[in-house]
């Protein structure tokens, strides 16, 4: 019985992953509004009923895709930071910000995470999902920076939320800009100045 349940659970997980995998390129290429559920279930090789077994609606499926994108970008950012061998918390934060801005220039990330997600999910849910993958690292870096005297003592949570709020706004700025390269350059310069300013007396 346990083996049968595990097999059933595995099949359910595979179906869910198939739906996310099918929906992701369609959301990226056509946007949320124009990605039809019939096209998604056909690409996933499942029925419409199977979709509704795993997701309440199209918005719920989109949220799962967005969360996958956020998780992958955060994981790759962590790998890039680890590969840099940088240990200074403020430099790590700067590297992370630069990586995030570069990642958000990717058309798939841009369309799903920056163009559609705020409109489809609403500001509150969009920021909650985004913070889930980033705020822990920012808190840890700020805490280390304070403990090592790298920056003056300051409220960690308020500072972390301020940094993430600024990052959200500049990534939206880059996504909506006509000249993405210029906007990326401007955004990087502003965020780097913001991070450097934390260490000022």
Residue ranges of model-derived segments:
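Basic, helix-initiating cap at the start of DNA-binding domains
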Residues: 1-30, 34-46, 59-63
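Short hydrophobic/aromatic patch on the recognition helix
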Residues: 45-55
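Alpha-helical DNA-contacting segments of helix-turn-helix folds
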Residues: 63-69
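Hydrophobic alpha-helical connector segments
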Residues: 64, 78-108, 159-163
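Amphipathic alpha-helical packing segments from all-alpha helical-bundle domains
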Residues: 71-78, 102-103, 123-148, 157-161, ...
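Secondary-structure edge/capping motif, primarily at the C-terminal ends of alpha-helices
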Residues: 80-84, 111-114, 174-178
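Amphipathic C-terminal alpha-helical segment
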Residues: 102-106, 135, 139-140, 144, ...
């Amino acid at each position: 019985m346990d083996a049968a349940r595990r097999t059933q659970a595995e099949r359910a997980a595979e179906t869910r992953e198939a739906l996310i995998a099918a929906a992701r390129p369609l959301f990226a290429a056509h946007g949320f509004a124009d990605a039809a559920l019939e096209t998604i279930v056909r690409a996933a090789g499942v029925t419409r009923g199977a979709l509704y077994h795993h997701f309440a609606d199209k918005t719920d499926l989109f949220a799962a895709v967005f969360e996958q994108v956020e998780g992958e970008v955060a994981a790759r950012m962590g790998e890039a930071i680890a590969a840099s061998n940088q240990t200074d918390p403020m430099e790590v934060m700067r590297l992370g910000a630069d990586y995030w801005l570069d990642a958000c220039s990717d058309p798939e990330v841009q369309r799903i995470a920056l163009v559609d997600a705020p409109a489809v999910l609403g500001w509150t849910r969009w920021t909650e999902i985004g913070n889930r993958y980033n705020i822990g690292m920012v808190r840890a870096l700020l805490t280390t920076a304070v403990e090592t005297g790298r920056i003056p003592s300051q409220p960690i949570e308020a500072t972390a939320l301020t940094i993430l709020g600024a990052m959200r706004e500049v990534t939206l700025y880059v996504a909506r800009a006509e000249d993405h390269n210029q906007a990326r350059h401007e955004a990087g310069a502003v965020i780097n100045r913001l991070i450097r300013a934390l260490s000022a007396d």
